């Protein structure tokens, strides 16, 4: 278990771009290859990097997400200490309205992050289909003495009539 890192996952990112698909569910719970959901990639990356304290920030239509997660049983995250914590859009003690952005949402769960024993926080979205070793990212972050480390990728636009294949 990595006692230095925890994660905050935003489950409702890009919903305005996926209107028809996210009318009744969050981006995180969109099906992928039938059995899986987009959040499975992110959770698997975190668990494979030995990160077991994970907060999931939701915005709306998250019942299918909670049904799928089952409090993290499939990732061995259903535990008394650490594990998965799901935050509704009204989690803040200081506001009675829904958060407007990620910073405001994180401020709303600041007490959760301060109570955690981990020093570093990975902030990620749930709609990323990737394979990331966060232990390597952490090692680079610490060895460089960085305050913030950001992972990015380059997207290559394609026309709708062709597909790019890695060689």
Language-model segments: what does each one mean?
Residues 1-167:
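Unchanged
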